């Protein structure tokens, strides 16, 4: 399809790497769509704007938003604060595990703060965010688990699609969203483990990890498959940490932002590692050979169960 589109528009791509990248992205889009169609029970009608959402007010007793960084002031969208509901309507509103991403309350927008005040039940995904929202709204804001951690590992296993190319390969999986790909650390780890590097190529095409294999066409199931089979994972990604924990992979976690960055999103990583009892896997200095302990089981299942109970209690209270 993408080839036909390019030819039909008489577009000439001189850089073959860009053409290959477009093909990979088209394949990735198809895999995401297939995953959505197969696993997500969505309404037939798509509600794509505030005007369309207004029509839902008479159909539901409660509205729930969450999670991820839907409350980041850098990605502000009033829909995630239920601005489409009429004032005074008798509908319960719940925010489950939204993340504001940043640690600087001064970055919060005035209209964002005003809309927060109207939400009946609010929780947050990270401790620093919960404190900021609590100070803004004047109420206690509990920290709850990301929804991915509320699902049993056995259920995630069912969604795994192994990437056949690497089924018989021993590899370190790299997945970095930030511009720092921590090459010196990855190279030392490669030497120590005597295995190859597989890099998931997302936003780092110009500054990517020097890997044996570059992967840019995977969908959600293949993403799970790559983590599930990895000998070690190197990442600065929140959800790559979660799935490494779920599949019990050894992992090195890196900070995506400098501590002096006013737009730093590191606080959610710190909270997650604390909840999972995995603080020791955080690498703060690439120049030091700071390899995590070789333990067979990373994290505390007991601690996670406690957090699951607290998170479910919030949901029950909000929707009772």
Regions found by a protein language model. Give the residues of each.
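Active-site-proximal region of nucleotide-activated glycan assembly enzymes
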Residues: 14-37, 78-142
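An anion/phosphate-binding loop that grips the pyrophosphate of nucleotide cofactors and donors
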Residues: 60, 119, 230
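Single conserved hydrophobic/aromatic residue that forms the stacking wall/gate
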Residues: 1-8, 12-13
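Active-site donor-nucleotide binding/catalytic segment of nucleotide-sugar enzymes
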Residues: 61-111, 137, 143-213
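Leloir-type glycosyltransferase catalytic cores
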Residues: 214, 270-320
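A donor-sugar binding/catalytic signature common to diverse glycosyltransferases
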Residues: 226-270
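Conserved nucleotide-sugar donor-binding subdomain of glycosyltransferases
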Residues: 17-61, 191-193
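Donor-binding and catalytic core of enzymes assembling or modifying cell-surface/extracellular glycoconjugates
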Residues: 196-240
